[in-house]
Amino acid sequence: WFYTANRFWTPEHGGTHIDAPIHFFKDRERLDELPLERLIAPGAVIDVSAKCEGNADYQVTVDDLTAWESEHGQQLNDVIVLLRTGFGKHWPDRVKYMGTNERGEAAVAKLHFPGLHPDAARWLVTNRKIKVIGLDTPSIDYGQSKDFKTHVTLYEQNIPAMENVANLDQLPEKGFTVIALPMKIKGGSGGPVRVVAVMDQ
């Protein structure tokens, strides 16, 4: 007979993961409290890759979101929003993906990657009812953020965010269902998440 067993260790916020709202806002949902119906929903890909190509500090705007709505004739309600910056293609080159190969506090000032503008986050929580938001960069706030307003704005309203989401370049802008199932860590502020897309027939 044959037997294999391994041990693994991981931070809550490494690799492809989901932030529970408690990560940046007190008394909000923890990882094990996220309802399943929020984690399985139609997907909407907002493609800003052309804008990010020459601007690693690009922040997704309200206009980017409303342009998707105008093109597809529907509002961003009851969907999982996925921001395609194109930065996923740079992984695992840390310099291209994050702006620096350094780690820890010394790296913070050198981080450069796109994110969601706080004004766009505020517009979403005020005017739309999205389930989850995700993107193909290390953080929902852009790399040069010092106050993490996008995190705070979303998480205050119990809207989780997925970071380091892979293969967004393989998805259409609509016409699929996202299934995002995180490791169910009791009391977790986040954790690894397996994200799959099922194409509509």
What are these regions (language model features)?
Residues 1-201:
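Active-/binding-site microenvironments in catalytic and ligand-binding cores
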